[in-house]
């Protein structure tokens, strides 16, 4: 995207700004490259975009999640583990990995290594943990185990409802 900061503020960022004013809980950051803002990194890896613009200028204090790190914009240009570390240091709270167990493992290993080595500071990690826990608390999300679901029972109930609203064969 070839927009400068003025164009972004007056056009592309308007929906984000409005969502933030209306207490959006989370924002997903895309892997788009904003050449005139940060010519080196896509938005999902850019401290300029996430911390300076989204958090400081737009005053967003909710959860920032990356787009899927297994997308070509990342995997064709970066090591997925290094990209995850960069995303967290840029200000993302959650790194999304949608495809491949090995990808998820690599990201987790690299993030763990980065925290242990100090590449990701404890302070930075605490900020993300706080925002995520605050969001979980707001929606009363817990880590309690959910009982297994009886699919047969659910299908029975669905069929009962559908049958109540179905026309008899001769009327159809």
Each predicted region: which residue ranges?
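Glycine-rich tight-turn/loop motif centered on a GG-T
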Residues: 1-10, 37-44, 114-121
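Phosphate/pyrophosphate-binding betaalpha-module
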Residues: 4-26
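Alpha-helix-loop-beta-strand connector modules within alpha/beta enzyme cores
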Residues: 11, 43-65
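Short acidic, glycine-rich surface-loop motifs adjacent to enzyme active sites
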Residues: 20-41
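Short coil/turn connectors at secondary-structure junctions
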Residues: 22-25, 59-61, 90-93
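Hydrophobic faces of well-ordered beta-strands that scaffold small-molecule active sites
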Residues: 27-29, 62-66, 95-96, 132
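Active-site-proximal loop/turn and secondary-structure-junction residues that shape catalytic pockets
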Residues: 31-35, 70, 101
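Preference for extracellular/luminal or secreted protein segments
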Residues: 56-57, 75-172
